[in-house]
A protein has these predicted regions:
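A short, charged, amphipathic alpha-helix used as a generic interaction element across diverse proteins
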Residues: 13-15, 22-46
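Surface-exposed flexible segments
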Residues: 15-24, 56-62
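Intrinsic-disorder/low-complexity peptide segments enriched for small residues
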Residues: 2-6, 34, 58
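Short, mixed-charge low-complexity intrinsically disordered segments
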Residues: 37-62
Length: 62
């Protein structure tokens, strides 16, 4: 399972559904990140493994 962590220009990503979703594959997470990056306030998105501690997978930027 994977999740997305967004770096925002101002505000938080709590109102964006893609930031709350859990993704079964990296490809699905990349697709969710692409949708998240369409939001003007999102600067970059980090894909992490949904485990404790979270493990970094990759960065996606504009």
């Amino acid at each position: 399972m994977f999740r997305l962590l967004a770096t925002m220009r101002r505000g938080s990503a709590s109102g964006i559904p893609q930031a709350w979703a859990r993704y079964a594959s990296v490809e699905a997470a990349r697709s969710g990140a692409a949708e998240l990056l369409r939001e003007d306030r999102v600067l970059r998105v980090m894909i992490v493994r949904n485990e404790i501690p979270q493990a970094f997978v990759e960065w996606l930027e504009r």
